[in-house]
């Protein structure tokens, strides 16, 4: 029988399998709780499996008993499958497509736009010293012929003046 034809309450998701997902070990562990229809272990990407039971009560017992146990060398997450297929491209969840575009814009700008603005804003604030202070710095650099030292000194002086 095909793995998608089982009712959801018979289908169990097994997560956190790592790369060592072993069909035989899963069949043995889950078969203890009742007859299985099938066991499917993901290979690309690895790390999860689906186990189908004949009876939904057996699936519920397996979830209750095996969640958090060690199988195939890993502490696994076991839960009833919710039936949603995940896309391989790991794009935005399907619910994002349902939201009207105008509504999304009203809530907040996209994250990509927000962080460069924040950065440029903080830069402009840190550079917004008065023109007199900028002149003071450039004059002290010319006098001392050691730009890095005089720059750091004048910078620390201006900070201490602001605090007082």
UniProtKB/Swiss-Prot annotation:
Q: What is the effect of changing residue 86 to E?
A: Abolishes interaction with NXF1
Q: Name one GO biological process term.
A: mRNA export from nucleus
Where found in the cell? Nucleus; Nucleus speckle; Cytoplasm
Pfam families on file: RRM_1 (PF00076)
Its biological function?
Splicing factor, which binds the consensus motif 5'-C[ACU][AU]C[ACU][AC]C-3' within pre-mRNA and promotes specific exons inclusion during alternative splicing. Interaction with YTHDC1, a RNA-binding protein that recognizes and binds N6-methyladenosine (m6A)-containing RNAs, promotes recruitment of SRSF3 to its mRNA-binding elements adjacent to m6A sites within exons. Also functions as an adapter involved in mRNA nuclear export. Binds mRNA which is thought to be transferred to the NXF1-NXT1 heterodimer for export (TAP/NXF1 pathway); enhances NXF1-NXT1 RNA-binding activity.
Reply yes or no: does the keyword Nucleus apply. yes
**Which gene is the coding source of this polypeptide chain?**
SRSF3
Q: Name one GO cellular component term.
A: nuclear speck
Per its UniProt record, what SUPFAM superfamilies does this chain match? RNA-binding domain, RBD
Q: Top-down, what is the taxonomic lineage of the species of origin?
A: Eukaryota, Metazoa, Chordata, Craniata, Vertebrata
Describe PTMs of this protein. Phosphorylated by CLK1, CLK2, CLK3 and CLK4. Extensively phosphorylated on serine residues in the RS domain.
What residue spans do the B- repeats cover?
Answer: 119-133, 149-164
Q: How does it assemble?
A: Interacts with CPSF6. Interacts with RBMY1A1. Interacts with SREK1/SFRS12. Interacts with NXF1. Interacts with YTHDC1, leading to recruitment to RNA elements adjacent to m6A sites. Interacts with SRSP; increases SRSF3 binding to specific exons.
GO MF terms, alphabetically ordered = mRNA binding; phospholipase binding; primary miRNA binding; protein-RNA sequence-specific adaptor activity; RNA binding; sequence-specific mRNA binding
- Compositionally biased residues, Basic and acidic residues: 129-142
Organism field: Homo sapiens (Human)
Q: Which residues form a coiled coil?
A: none
The entry sums up its family as follows: Belongs to the splicing factor SR family.
- InterPro entries according to UniProt: Nucleotide-bd_a/b_plait_sf, RBD_domain_sf, RRM_dom, SRSF
Phosphoserine found at? 5
Q: What is this protein called?
A: Serine/arginine-rich splicing factor 3
Give the main location.
nucleus
Positions where N-acetylmethionine occurs in the chain: 1
Q: Which CDD domains match?
A: RRM_SRSF3
Which keywords does UniProt give here? Acetylation, Cytoplasm, mRNA processing, mRNA splicing, mRNA transport, Nucleus, Phosphoprotein, Repeat, RNA-binding, Transport
